[in-house]
Structures are given as structure tokens and as C-alpha cells.
A protein has these predicted regions:
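Sec/Tat signal peptide C-region and signal peptidase I cleavage site
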Residues: 19-23
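Feature captures C-terminal
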Residues: 25-41, 83, 87-252
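Post-signal-peptide N-terminal segment of Sec-exported extracytoplasmic proteins
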Residues: 49-59
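Acidic/histidine-rich, surface-exposed loop or edge segments in extracytoplasmic proteins
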Residues: 63-80, 208-215
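Membrane metalloprotein/metal-transporter helix-bundle signature
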Residues: 35-46, 52, 70-73
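Bacterial N-terminal signal peptides that target proteins for export
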Residues: 1-9
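Bacterial N-terminal signal peptides
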Residues: 9-18
Length: 252
């Protein structure tokens, strides 16, 4: 068989395979998943050589992740429109806003997407906080005019809610519009300047929080969010959180 015949045969075979494959249609019948923590308990017969290599690094990781910071009275989770974990986190940012001598922020804001794990009930270790806030986000305090804070509330309503501090009461409609909002029990004044404690990531207008880019002044406190959280737990020793109606979706 000459070269041209071989090429022709290969092309015909390839075409047959392609036709056969494209003719088959696959449909997903079901999807199931479970969370499986990969720990040493899964390894019934650990490799001694691998263990010797890993052990020094494991010791370093354990020294970072295992220290106890305090206790949590309840398990905390994140979710819209309001949740125990986002409530606690937003309040912690307000608490941390005074670290460099600034006045206490009028409002704290965290994004649900930035809270990557749950807070356990009982003992809270440094590793738990690192899992909740694994990113290199830092605390900033923004000064904003009231009219722009109103726009920020529109941003929050448009995504169905984010984590806001205890000073905020926001009612949103089913179609994600602001029905009513107050800060510190008062309606927002267009000309007043408000201080917002939040993440530098959100301050750039990310996660639909575009109004934050209109801040008239920005104070970068330099502290990682997870460090702010850790210091708050150490300071308070026992933490707690509950649903307070900070963000409510109107029912028809």
C-alpha cells in the first residue's frame, strides 16, 4: 500500500470514528457529591519515606492552624439575605475600624462570596478563621456621601443581600429593589458623610458593589481580614451571632 493509500485509509477511519462519536448523545442523569476531608485517617498504611518528607511541613502547618483563639456559642453559616456568619463578620469589621485611631465606622460590609467556610460551634482555632477568610483581603474604611451610600444599598439589594453590620436595617422587594433603609436607626441623608468598614476587594467595586468606588476618602488600615477576625475572637474570648432582621425581603 503506497503512502497516498495509507493517508486515505487513515482519513476514512478517522471519519468513521468521528461520525460514531458525534452520533452518540450523552445526558446527565444525576449529580451527587459529598464533602470528604482528606486526613491521615484515610491512610491505613502510610508510606514511611513520604511521612519523613511531609512531617516537617506538617509541623509548621499545625503550628499555624491549630492554636485556639476562643469559643463560639453557635455554629455560623453564610447566606443571603442575612446570615449568622455575615452578621458577625460585618460587626467585626466595625470593631476593627478603630484600630488606627479612626472613629468607629457607621456601617460594616462583607460579601457572602468572601466567607468561604462555616464557623464551628465550640472551640475556634486559627485554622477555622483562615478557612473562612483565605484571601489576602485587607480592611479599609471608606468615607462616602449619603447619596452614594443609598446607591450602595441599591447594589446590596440587587444581589439579594450581603453581610451588613447591626447598625443597618434594609428592606428589599422581591424584585431586589430597596423598599426602606436606615443606618443607626435613621434614614440616610444625602449630604452627610458616612464611614464604611469593608474589604479592599469590595472598595474597588467588585462583586457588584460599584458605589464604593465613589468614596471621597479611603483609609487603608493594612490588616488582613482574617487577622481582624482572629484578634476579635481573642479579645472577646466567646463569640456569638443571631439573625436580627438586618436585611429582610418583602413577602407578597
Amino acid at each position: 500500500m503506497n503512502h497516498s493509500h495509507k493517508c486515505m485509509m487513515l482519513l476514512m477511519i478517522s471519519a468513521l470514528f468521528a461520525t460514531g462519536i458525534s452520533a452518540q448523545k450523552y445526558k446527565v442523569k444525576s449529580i451527587a457529591w459529598e464533602r470528604l476531608e482528606v486526613t491521615a485517617a484515610l491512610d491505613s498504611a502510610p508510606d514511611s519515606d513520604a511521612f519523613r518528607i511531609v512531617e516537617p511541613y506538617k509541623a509548621k502547618v499545625d503550628s499555624t492552624m491549630m492554636p485556639v483563639l476562643g469559643l463560639s456559642r453557635v455554629p455560623m453559616t453564610a447566606g443571603r439575605p442575612e446570615s449568622t456568619l455575615s452578621n458577625w463578620a460585618a460587626d467585626v469589621l466595625v470593631e476593627g475600624s478603630t484600630a488606627t485611631g479612626l472613629e468607629t465606622a457607621d456601617m460594616g460590609l462583607v460579601n457572602m462570596g468572601g466567607l468561604r467556610n462555616n464557623m464551628p460551634e465550640g472551640i475556634v482555632r486559627r485554622g477555622d478563621v483562615m478557612l473562612i477568610s483565605p484571601f489576602e483581603n485587607r480592611l479599609v474604611v471608606l468615607e462616602m456621601k449619603g447619596k452614594d451610600v443609598k446607591e450602595l444599598m441599591d447594589n446590596i439589594a440587587s444581589v439579594g443581600g450581603e453581610g451588613v453590620s447591626s447598625s443597618v436595617r434594609l428592606v428589599i422587594t422581591k424584585d431586589r429593589k430597596v423598599a426602606h433603609v436606615t443606618i443607626g436607626g435613621k434614614e440616610i441623608e444625602d449630604g452627610k458623610v458616612y464611614r464604611i468598614a469593608t474589604l479592599d476587594y469590595l472598595a474597588e467595586g467588585n462583586d457588584h458593589m460599584t458605589a464604593l468606588k465613589k468614596a471621597i476618602k479611603r483609609h487603608s488600615l493594612g490588616m488582613l481580614i482574617r487577622d481582624v477576625m482572629s484578634e476579635s475572637i481573642i479579645k472577646n474570648r466567646v463569640i456569638d451571632s443571631k439573625m436580627e432582621g438586618r436585611i429582610i425581603v418583602q413577602q407578597p
